[in-house]
């Protein structure tokens, strides 16, 4: 079963070698409503930490030319916050480790100044002037202001199983790990963005919360998820459902595997599991990403011995970000990492009966979180089958 909560996987993992070259982040995304117009607006908040063993008195920024010349790796807490839409932006606030209060064990809690993240709460603010954003390209961010005060209820989990278990974590077997403690999460509270007030409510937030950690990122980098779902069969909203797809090209003990995805659908209490690491399921996956002038499109087909899932997602480029990260070694190889929160599409679920796949439901999805990127040196990606 993948719907298995385990907050020990949300603990900070930067110990041993990962303290010297490693990152850990807690990601949160949700939809809010304009307090005046009621219009939906998606937001994200992330707490990203790296290389605590290399801490200095000030945040060490890996893209600063002086640090690159000195061979310094990044070391800091970065609070990343922003929005998607035609005014999409990402705002970064950096803290030196001496100014960070971290309870690394479960339940995790990380705090710096007025910024806080835990299993049940998010608070903070970021303010970047246009002049500062232009003068500091090493901040890798835009200009704007955002503050938030939220509670979090992580309702449905995606536990990837043995691949992120303690033995494989201790062995640092994978370059990048994933755990979604709240692939369906209920947020409540307020957000202020560039002077406008927004309200966040459990019924309309379509919230998500996960974390990644490791020594490097993946390429390609794929993520698709939504819990704003409507059955075409019944025309009813699926209020106890969520899908989540992620991965790319995992490395185990520095050896890259064929491009692979982890995918699940929690369908009104029933689990559809397409986790390639569960060998008994004999999962097969094909996926493609196509970039057009005005939109990007994902196609994913996953199949196991019991079922199949076909996912198609669209997102307008004008509503998306090219989201920025630097790796813990100081490199910045993801320079075209498309990231959005306004995706829409369909998911078809099939059950296998007497050797044939029978359509169980076709689901309309909106408010889809979506991501795709490849390292700069990779060949353009079209379609790969992973077995």
Regions found by a protein language model. Give the residues of each.
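Structured soluble/peripheral alpha/beta segments that form catalytic or ligand/cofactor-binding pockets
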Residues: 1-387
